[in-house]
Amino acid sequence: MPIGVPKVPFRSPGEGDTSWVDIYNRLYRERLFFLGQEVDTDISNQLISLMIYLSIEKDTKDLYLFINSPGGWVISGMAIYDTMQFVRPDVQTICMGLAASIASFILVGGAITKRIAFPHARVMIHQPASSFYEAQTGEFILEAEELLKLRETITRVYVQRTGKPIWVVSEDMERDVFMSATEAQAHGIVDLVAVQ
């Protein structure tokens, strides 16, 4: 039996009455965000708007992005990554569960020294893929060229943010590479593994 989204009490500063808000809105007010689904334009736009709004509201207090995602759309994930680099507050990324595919790209985009993985978290990197198989030859070639550009961009970001040589990152992206939290730390995707 689904319980829906829990409601929690919240009192705005300066207000006497407590109101009940859903737990996500309460956590947003504490600058905590959750990427707990496949990355698509809806969740991307929601996270981007929250980061921008809260960075305008207070640009010196860190934002926290908790990640448990199988990945998803590359362009939507890159939009989240770019916003994380654009906003003034540091964005701390915390992997709990799984950060796979474009979600691992978002994870590595957190502020250097502020990227964390829970002890039993898993991280997976690979090259971008497409499901555009039924296209005409010309469209297929254009799609392949775009995928190659995306792969080069993603590889360059991983190299820059992990400190690993380009040949290591390129080789790892050839297939699905799953890592434990400590392996992700050794790979430079996260800086710390949370203690139990």
UniProtKB/Swiss-Prot annotation:
Top-level taxon of the source organism: Eukaryota
Annotated GO CC locations: chloroplast stroma; endopeptidase Clp complex
Signal peptide region: none
Subcellular location: Plastid, Chloroplast stroma
Active site, per annotation: 101 (nucleophile), 126
Chloroplast found in the keyword field: yes
GO MF entries: ATP-dependent peptidase activity; ATPase binding; serine-type endopeptidase activity
CDD domains hit by this protein: S14_ClpP_2 (cd07017)
One Pfam family here: CLP_protease
Catalytic activity: Hydrolysis of proteins to small peptides in the presence of ATP and magnesium. alpha-casein is the usual test substrate. In the absence of ATP, only oligopeptides shorter than five residues are hydrolyzed (such as succinyl-Leu-Tyr-|-NHMec, and Leu-Tyr-Leu-|-Tyr-Trp, in which cleavage of the -Tyr-|-Leu- and -Tyr-|-Trp bonds also occurs)
Keywords per UniProt: Chloroplast, Hydrolase, Plastid, Protease, Serine protease
Keyword Protease among record annotations: yes
GO BP annotations listed: protein quality control for misfolded or incompletely synthesized proteins
Assigned EC number: 3.4.21.92
Quaternary structure annotation from Swiss-Prot or TrEMBL: Component of the chloroplastic Clp protease core complex.
Family: Belongs to the peptidase S14 family.
Function: Cleaves peptides in various proteins in a process that requires ATP hydrolysis. Has a chymotrypsin-like activity. Plays a major role in the degradation of misfolded proteins.
PANTHER family (UniProt xref): ATP-DEPENDENT CLP PROTEASE PROTEOLYTIC SUBUNIT, CHLOROPLASTIC ATP-DEPENDENT CLP PROTEASE PROTEOLYTIC SUBUNIT 1
Entry protein name: ATP-dependent Clp protease proteolytic subunit
